[in-house]
Amino acid sequence: MTDQTTRLPVRRALISVSDKTGVVDFARELEALGVEILSTGGTFKLLRENGIAAIEVADYTGFPEMMDGRVKTLHPKIHGGILGRRDLDGAVMAEHGIAPIDLVAVNLYPFAATVAKPGCTLPDAIENIDIGGPTMVRSAAKNHKDVAIVVNAEDYAAVVDNLKNGGLTYAQRFDLALKAFEHTAGYDGMIANYLGGIDQSTEQLSTDNRSLFPRTYNMQFIKAQDMRYGENPHQQAAFYVEKPDEACVATARQLQGKELSFNNVADTDAALECVKSFTKPACVIVKHANPCGVAVVPENEGGIRKAYDLAYATDSESAFGGIIAFNRELDGETAQAIVERQFVEVIIAPKVSQAARDVVASKANVRLLECGEWPAERSPGWDYKRVNGGLLIQSRDIGMITEADLKIVTQRAPTEQEIHDLIFAWKVAKFVKSNAIVYAKNRQTVGVGAGQMSRVNSARIAAIKAEHAGLQVQGAVMASDAFFPFRDGIDNAAKAGITAVIQPGGSMRDNEVIAAADEAGIAMVFTGMRHFRH
């Protein structure tokens, strides 16, 4: 049985890295500890230029680097030194003059960066598939009982600190080995994804028309937390994250409150992604992944405090136990209004002031998240939906429209105010479960109908919600995430007092729907873009 606490010293290390961040300082620390350093290629040159007495692998093995660097470390003196079991293979190693290598610091050719370059050819990609690196990494990781493997520059300092304290424990070497296997798994996955997208239907393979969807799909997510349970208490769950390009729930920092639940994460994602759609101060309140209240206010006209008041007024009942997201720094006044007015599960904002933190601290269970700023232009990416026996993959729905994209299809054109409200309502409808209907006025939701099997019933629910909240539908606009299959949706909207409608268009009965709008004096615009959300 392996001793979990015994520290193993390092007498010989092999360093060969593509990412040279921190490697000189790391090697210098090892040298100061009396460690003999073997190295290759550019790493060897860099170390020697910085006064570190590294030994080139070709000199160590007596076998030259060859084939344009394809064969450097693939030698028994290297792999025997890494893979040799100290308690079993000592005699064989001595017989063949193989010295043990106790630490391997390797990271791999930058395949992802290479294939991301414009004009990257298949030969370019192939030449950047590392062979010797993964072989050493896997060898060292397999023999972690006797060898430490370091694939991440972020681990250099901790490794040095432990060596100064006598060496690395088995538990530490095991953790480094796990990171190594994760590293090579991700690397091989990238290669398989890239090559799997190449069109093989022609004799001359080319990267020109590479498919976005490879033959096998490989992704790597890192566990952020285990959860008490999933969507329901009888389901097990965990939260895994990738490395996103923008601020999101996965990157958010929790400042206080209970641990996030499975449903908290899903609902917070919905709220934050919705509020990102707006450039002016905005508040989004979400319940069960649906916006139940959204408002946007002009700059210098009350800020997020006013936006929160208006969003809350849409549906104060549903806001109870909801998620609140802002696109501006959370201030103390707004935080005070929230905690005095309602029970809230999560509050998320790009930044949280100290005054707001002090206020929310009075409600210890409230989860307060700070996610950082996001760019105006949304990052492309992928959405996944698990089905029994498979996985659906699609590009993220980041499609948006501007006033220039609107096609006026009715006799009456919308007023300037109606256009502002139509675009606002359209942005909200994108985040409402289909069939989605949103009533809005003065960039405030006045009624939201979500998740109904018939579109007309979603419209009826939006009207009921508005009436229940005491909000005026007369003069409001309506957004629909998909086309109206029949005129009844417009007829009901007219009875409720709707004056303008935004929808994708594209129904076989568009003419009937347009006629219904004209009969009621309703202005209607088509976007040509659908926003189903399931």
From Swiss-Prot:
Domain of life: Bacteria
Gene3D superfamilies per UniProt: 3.40.140.20, Methylglyoxal synthase-like domain
UniProt keyword annotation of Transferase present: yes
SUPFAM superfamilies: Cytidine deaminase-like, Methylglyoxal synthase-like
A family per Pfam: MGS
Any one Gene Ontology molecular-function term assigned to this protein's record: IMP cyclohydrolase activity
EC annotation from Swiss-Prot or TrEMBL: 2.1.2.3, 3.5.4.10
One of the record's GO cellular component terms: cytosol
Pathway this chain belongs to: Purine metabolism; IMP biosynthesis via de novo pathway; 5-formamido-1-(5-phospho-D-ribosyl)imidazole-4-carboxamide from 5-amino-1-(5-phospho-D-ribosyl)imidazole-4-carboxamide (10-formyl THF route): step 1/1; Purine metabolism; IMP biosynthesis via de novo pathway; IMP from 5-formamido-1-(5-phospho-D-ribosyl)imidazole-4-carboxamide: step 1/1
Keyword vocabulary terms for this entry: Hydrolase, Multifunctional enzyme, Purine biosynthesis, Transferase
GO term, biological process aspect, one: 'de novo' IMP biosynthetic process
Catalysis: reaction(s): (6R)-10-formyltetrahydrofolate + 5-amino-1-(5-phospho-beta-D-ribosyl)imidazole-4-carboxamide = 5-formamido-1-(5-phospho-D-ribosyl)imidazole-4-carboxamide + (6S)-5,6,7,8-tetrahydrofolate; IMP + H2O = 5-formamido-1-(5-phospho-D-ribosyl)imidazole-4-carboxamide
InterPro entries noted in UniProt: AICAR_Tfase_dup_dom_sf, Cytidine_deaminase-like, MGS-like_dom, MGS-like_dom_sf, PurH-like
Domain annotation MGS-like: ranges: 6-151
UniProt keyword Hydrolase, yes or no: yes
SMART domains: AICARFT_IMPCHas, MGS
Family classification: Belongs to the PurH family.
UniProt cross-references to NCBIfam families, sorted A to Z: PRK00881.1 (NF002049), purH (TIGR00355)
Domain notes: The IMP cyclohydrolase activity resides in the N-terminal region.
Listed name of the protein: Bifunctional purine biosynthesis protein PurH
Organism of provenance: Stutzerimonas stutzeri (strain A1501)
Taxon lineage: Bacteria, Pseudomonadati, Pseudomonadota, Gammaproteobacteria, Pseudomonadales
Name of the gene this protein is made from: purH
